[in-house]
Amino acid sequence: MDESILEGLSSVKGYLGGAINNYTGECLVCDAAKLSGNLEATSATFNDIFRDSHAVSKNLKLGATEIMEIHTEKAVILMGCSGEESRVHLHAFAVFNSDGNVALGKMALKKLLPQAVEALA
């Protein structure tokens, strides 16, 4: 899998970077051209947070977490899951600046995950 799979996300207004990780946190593809810092390492930490949210929501009998949104002073981080029962369990991450089009980002993230699963299945 290469960075071209992130094109749908990268075309959204305000996109700063994105990554796709397997369930264990290994970064499979990463685009951090507009971000400072190490997105590959950071996405592994976000992966842990997302896995914890899976456990918490399942503990409450709500099912696995599908999408998560974190707002910071300068950005919005979206995290999405391909589904625990999908052929390949993936987590995708996207970072947008605070005035980016987060609604379109969510749609692009939901569209990207099945494509990534198909590419790896």
What is each stretch, according to the model?
Residues 1-17, 22-23, 27-121:
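Non-catalytic interaction/Regulatory regions outside core domains
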